[in-house]
């Protein structure tokens, strides 16, 4: 079986192929929300998180996430910086204004000068520049949630 993996994952071995029905790992590591307008990237992150034991919720825009209200009880959020209408940073401001406190991991292909400082001012918990390894994202999730890093199944 051959899988196409977005270029944002520098190591395609970190994105496992979907498992046959009935053989998935139990999702016990918590709910992680993904906000990414690039469908292939969003699906790759969702597969990675699922294989690591997370329940992943996916959204193609900040507006979709905010309308859903799912951020209120998420373990953390992984969001692209550049989204169609509301940026990842603006979304985080709105999440905080609503009193929700999940940590946000910001991913971006535009790691411009001053971005890290701006991200810190907005309360971003971690920033990953694309392309990144799947293991780097799992490490960031473990770091911002204060939990041990879940592993990927052998194979």
For each predicted feature, which ranges?
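Charged docking surfaces used in two-component/phosphorelay signaling
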Residues: 43-47, 51
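Alpha4 helix (beta4-alpha4-beta5 surface) of REC/receiver domains from two-component response regulators
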Residues: 90, 111-126
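Acidic catalytic/metal-coordinating carboxylates
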Residues: 60-61, 87-90
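Active-site residues of response regulator receiver
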Residues: 80, 108
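Conserved acidic carboxylate
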Residues: 36
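C-terminal output helix
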Residues: 114, 132-141
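The feature encodes the CheY-like receiver
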Residues: 42, 84
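Short amphipathic alpha-helix used as the core "switch/output" element in two-component signaling
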Residues: 67, 89-100
